[in-house]
């Protein structure tokens, strides 16, 4: 038992597992030697002795791969205001349990007003850094005091374990007992150990604390009928709905079930499955919700520390504001529009040079697009920065936002709103200065602007957009300008040159979009972050140069977005922000809006704000080598001559898995499956020219790969990447027959040019190709296991006492598996550690699932020769089977054709692509499935879309009246689009058709 007094410091926070006991003994010894006579230096105020007893842990998260965790608790006393650590101690380690019992006591001399205690639970790992199991941050100002005169029952409190960052996976409670020692006139320290021998508990005098304890100890509500709670082999709790044969991560409640019908529940689960497989890029950064902790606890600032979120967007740190401190599940469209506006404002000059030096000198300056000439910029005199204002549609923040001092004086010209001043430039032209938000404009402000001027440009000078003058510019890179101090001092800066080039001829005649050439798809350096430049390699491949760090990369920096920006809702067309510099928006004589690029002197109908890669999606990486392999592969696939013309299946949607299994496995001659597929759904009228078959593959994929059936399970790192369940035989006695069926379905998909809707771990594809699985393949599947093996590879593992065997846990029982004959008697040394690592990888990915994989390959090779598949590598095989998950709208638009009166410049077509660009990633995938029958894109993009008669580009055909909804022909990749009269009408009915369409009634 030790008394830890401030200041006691531990220098090395990254302790190895063999250093911790030694440091702990030194810390305890130091604290006990100085327990008397040490002047308290932890802060101002009265100090008291706090007794802390770490009782136990309840239902901790499972971190070990082969069994339960080895938890211990680290206690840190720190100053709340300064975040400075004063003392650090820890408990002993309890082996192989998720409900450890420590029953260890510690004494701290604390200042209740400004000290806090941080309890961190870790899983001891002999190979790598200890795993984090959760933390509790406790303020010390409201803890009870022991009363030695009363009969004291043993009291405690269960604290909910909290995550340290948004990626932490924690669960369970930490049971603690904390109270101050009674004040006995300086005898506290001397008698503390004597009192401890006699005391067995004390009374909590805070009634609120007891009430909160009672509330937290209540058991969770019972599960609804038909639900079951289970724990997978990774220790994650999930819930099984036996009513509709589905699984989910969150705990259901009786209220949720009673409020919705079975059909609604099934639909919700299906939509969740759609998002899980389609939005691979968003779910992988899925933010784990943090449960709220009751009991009147104070704020826990440790939860806001998130290094992952800070590192996610470091390449854009100069152009973006800091990420939010806490995880965000949804963001308002206004915030998204501001983010898009900030990205659209970062534009290089004509030479591709960024003005990063200007931004670095003044990171908090606000740069807006300029709409005055260089002469006006030199002569415009601006007062000191004004008070903080709301960001308007035309504002762009470069760097972090900082509040500015209030304005000292305001010049107001009679007849103008408050804060506005009329001036003339050197050429005698009149312009107007808004001292409220430090902007200038050529347009004379009207009096209605007075009430908006001081409060912050909520409408700013964009109000003149509503004036009914067809030929006057509506917006020229936003008709306002912010002249910051660095801009005035830059004689020949890139911004000044851009301003000069933008408005060298402000009175240019209005061009007609009808006569202007169609914009060419050329390489552009627009929207690159500051300090970045794009160049073309000799082989024609673009690469990017970061002049800030003097590095080059093939990856487009514009596609690296913070985590909280990757799952956004659909954009609102009114929240897109200002136009890029040098662009102007005008209205044609027929009322349509078009855009002028004064930089390249071209006009177009497309809104340039919607061409940002952040909105359109990543470009499709064309692979010439893959194309050649695929053409060779298709050429070698021969259809037998002595088979029927087509293979027919008539199925029910609600029983598609079992019916497909019985029908396909009843075929004794696999060559029959190479005939043309003809799928019909019961009670639906649809001719299958390819579209219904794609729908069948999509629906069947969701059922085959559903972990509910026990054939597959999620990998250790996420809940969407699949791997074979090594215990599938315990879930289904006929599991090998089902794996043969799944192999046949996969072979059918590849043979007929269709795609599966599922993602497997990379070793799965390597096993199909018969390739050796390496340690690097482990990293993407199980990072913790990878780090452990990596540590063994880089260090001498002799001191770990490892043997050539592995402990495997199945349903609570632990079995020892020898990696080689008599492996339990062979020690891992520095000489044989590579053999040990290879055997562990072989056991982890191959040996446990060898029977299942052989059955899968048996069905797969019945339709496709394995030698022909081996011309692809594992990455190409994944694309061959599953396609691409992202939708590049620019590529989609470029490879589309129009019929029956539609053309690329038709207003309805312009509105259609605008609606697609304003959709979020999920809605684009659903639109793609609506028009093609699948949610996957071929390897080389939309140029290789296939229809019923071979290659068939996406087609939009004019059809019907404006009152009708759009309809799709998935067999021909065609969308019948009525000639709607407004953009809002088109967008509403397109979304209605996409979100509510199911089946093939009346549509082939």
UniProtKB/Swiss-Prot annotation:
The modification Phosphothreonine is found at residues 347, 396. Residues 30-154 form the C2 domain. SMART domains: C2, HECTc, WW. Disulfide bonds: none annotated. It comes from the Eukaryota. One of its GO terms (biological process) is response to salt stress. One of its GO terms (molecular function) is ubiquitin protein ligase activity. Coiled coil: none annotated. It is found in: Cytoplasm; Golgi apparatus; Endosome, Multivesicular body. Phosphorylated; which impairs interaction with SCNN. Interaction with YWHAH inhibits dephosphorylation. Aldosterone induces Ser-477 phosphorylation by SGK1. The modification Phosphoserine is found at residues 341, 371, 475, 477-478, 493, 504, 508, 512, 516. Pathway: Protein modification; protein ubiquitination. Residues 207-230, 272-407, 453-523 are annotated as: Disordered. Residues 347-359, 366-376 have a biased composition (Polar residues). Pfam families: C2 (PF00168), HECT (PF00632), WW (PF00397). Activated by NDFIP1- and NDFIP2-binding. Its main location: cytoplasm. Changing residue 371 to A: Weakly reduces phosphorylation by SGK1. Residues 221-254, 414-447, 526-559, 577-610 form the WW domain. GO terms for cellular component: glutamatergic synapse; Golgi apparatus; multivesicular body; postsynapse. The active site is at 971 (glycyl thioester intermediate). E3 ubiquitin-protein ligase that mediates the polyubiquitination of lysine and cysteine residues on target proteins and is thereby implicated in the regulation of various signaling pathways including autophagy, innate immunity or DNA repair. Inhibits TGF-beta signaling by triggering SMAD2 and TGFBR1 ubiquitination and proteasome-dependent degradation. Downregulates autophagy and cell growth by ubiquitinating and reducing cellular ULK1 or ASCT2 levels. This is E3 ubiquitin-protein ligase NEDD4-like.
């Amino acid at each position: 038992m030790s008394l830890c007094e401030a200041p006691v410091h531990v220098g090395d926070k990254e302790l190895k597992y063999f250093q911790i006991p030694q440091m702990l003994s030194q810390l305890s010894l130091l604290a006990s030697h100085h327990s008397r006579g040490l002047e308290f230096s932890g802060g101002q105020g009265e100090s008291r002795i706090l007794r802390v007893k770490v009782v136990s842990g309840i239902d901790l998260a499972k971190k070990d791969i082969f069994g339960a965790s080895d938890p211990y608790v680290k206690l840190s006393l720190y100053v709340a205001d300064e975040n400075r650590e004063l003392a650090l101690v820890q408990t002993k380690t309890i082996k192989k349990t998720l409900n450890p019992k420590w029953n260890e006591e510690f004494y701290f001399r604390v200042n209740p007003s400004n000290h806090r205690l941080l309890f961190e639970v870790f899983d001891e790992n002999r190979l790598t850094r200890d795993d984090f199991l959760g933390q509790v941050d406790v303020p010390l100002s409201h803890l009870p005091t022991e009363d030695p005169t009363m009969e004291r029952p043993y009291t405690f409190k269960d604290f909910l374990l909290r995550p340290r960052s948004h990626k932490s996976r924690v669960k369970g409670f930490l049971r603690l007992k904390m109270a101050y020692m009674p004040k006995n006139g300086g005898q506290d320290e001397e008698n503390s150990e004597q009192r401890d021998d006699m005391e067995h508990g004390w009374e909590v005098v805070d009634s609120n604390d007891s009430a909160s304890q009672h509330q937290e100890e209540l058991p969770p509500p019972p599960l609804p009928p038909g639900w079951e709670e289970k724990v997978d082999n990774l220790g994650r709790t999930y819930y099984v709905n036996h009513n509709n044969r589905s699984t989910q991560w969150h705990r259901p409640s009786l209220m949720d079930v009673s409020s919705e019908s079975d059909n609604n529940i099934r639909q919700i689960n299906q939509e969740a499955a759609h998002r899980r497989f389609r939005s691979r890029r968003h779910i992988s950064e899925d933010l784990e919700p943090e449960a709220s902790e009751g009991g009147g606890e104070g704020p826990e600032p440790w939860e806001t520390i998130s290094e992952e979120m800070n590192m996610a967007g470091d390449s854009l740190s100069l152009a973006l504001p800091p990420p939010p401190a806490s995880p965000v599940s949804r963001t308002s469209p206004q915030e998204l529009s501001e983010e898009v506006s900030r990205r659209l404002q970062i534009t290089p000059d004509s030479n591709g040079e960024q003005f990063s030096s200007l931004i670095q000198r003044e990171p908090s300056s606000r740069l807006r697009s300029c709409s005055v000439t260089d002469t006006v910029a030199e002569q415009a005199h601006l007062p000191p920065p004004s008070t903080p204002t709301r960001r308007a549609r035309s504002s762009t923040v470069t760097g972090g936002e900082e509040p500015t001092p209030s304005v000292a004086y305001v010049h107001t010209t009679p007849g103008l709103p408050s804060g506005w001043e009329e001036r003339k430039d050197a050429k005698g032209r009149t312009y107007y200065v808004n001292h409220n938000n430090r902007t200038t404009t050529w347009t004379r402000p009207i009096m209605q602007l007075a009430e908006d001027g001081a409060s912050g440009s909520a409408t700013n000078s964009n109000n003149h957009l509503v004036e009914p003058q067809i030929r006057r510019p509506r917006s020229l890179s936003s008709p306002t300008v912010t002249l910051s101090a660095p801009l005035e001092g830059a004689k020949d800066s890139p911004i000044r040159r851009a301003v000069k080039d933008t408005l060298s001829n402000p009175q240019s005649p209005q061009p007609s979009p009808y006569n202007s050439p169609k914009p060419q798809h050329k390489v552009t350096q627009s929207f690159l972050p500051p300090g970045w430049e794009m160049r073309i390699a000799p082989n024609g491949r673009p690469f990017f140069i970061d002049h800030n760090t003097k590095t080059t990369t093939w990856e487009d920096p514009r596609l690296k977005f913070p985590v909280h920006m990757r799952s956004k809702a659909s954009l609102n067309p009114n929240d897109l922000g200002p136009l890029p510099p040098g662009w102007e928006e005008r209205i044609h004589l027929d009322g349509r809006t078009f855009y002028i690029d004064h930089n390249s002197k071209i006009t177009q109908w497309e809104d340039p704000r919607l061409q940002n890669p952040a909105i359109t999606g990543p470009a499709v990486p064309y692979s010439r080598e893959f194309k050649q392999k695929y053409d060779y592969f298709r050429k070698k696939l021969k259809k037998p001559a002595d088979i029927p013309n087509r293979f027919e299946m008539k199925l029910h949607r609600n029983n598609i898995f079992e019916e497909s299994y019985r029908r396909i496995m009843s075929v004794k001659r696999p060559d029959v499956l190479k005939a043309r597929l003809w799928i019909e759904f019961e009670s639906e009228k649809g001719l299958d020219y390819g579209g219904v078959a794609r729908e069948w593959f999509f629906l069947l994929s969701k059922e085959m790969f559903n972990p509910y059936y026990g054939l597959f399970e999620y990998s250790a790192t996420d809940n969407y990447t699949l791997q074979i369940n090594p215990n599938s035989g315990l879930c289904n006695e006929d599991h090998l027959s089902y794996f043969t069926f799944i192999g046949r379905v996969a072979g059918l998909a590849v043979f007929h040019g269709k795609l599966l809707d599922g993602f497997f771990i990379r070793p799965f594809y390597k096993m199909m190709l018969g390739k050796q699985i390496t340690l690097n393949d482990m990293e993407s599947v199980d990072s913790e296991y990878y780090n452990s093996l990596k540590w063994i590879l880089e260090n001498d593992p002799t001191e770990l006492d490892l043997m050539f065997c592995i402990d495997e846990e199945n349903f609570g029982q632990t079995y020892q598996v020898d990696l080689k004959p008599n492996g339990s008697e062979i020690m891992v040394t520095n000489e044989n550690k590579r053999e040990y690592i290879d055997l562990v990888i072989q056991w982890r990915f191959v040996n446990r699932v060898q029977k299942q994989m052989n059955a899968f390959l048996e069905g797969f090779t019945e339709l496709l020769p394995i030698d022909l598949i081996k011309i692809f590598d594992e990455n190409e095989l994944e694309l061959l089977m599953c396609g691409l998950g992202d939708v590049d709208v620019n590529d989609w638009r470029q490879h589309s054709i129009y019929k029956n009166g539609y053309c690329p410049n038709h207003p309805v077509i312009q509105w259609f692509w605008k609606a697609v660009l304003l959709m979020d990633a999920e809605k684009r995938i659903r639109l793609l499935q609506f028009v093609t029958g699948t949610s996957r894109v071929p390897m080389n993009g939309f140029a290789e879309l296939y229809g019923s008669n071979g290659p068939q580009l996406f087609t939009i055909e004019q059809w019907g009246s404006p009152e009708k909804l759009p309809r799709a022909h998935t067999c021909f990749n065609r969308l019948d689009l009525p000639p709607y009269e407004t953009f809002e009408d088109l967008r509403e009915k397109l979304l209605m058709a996409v979100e509510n369409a199911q089946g093939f009634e009346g549509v082939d």
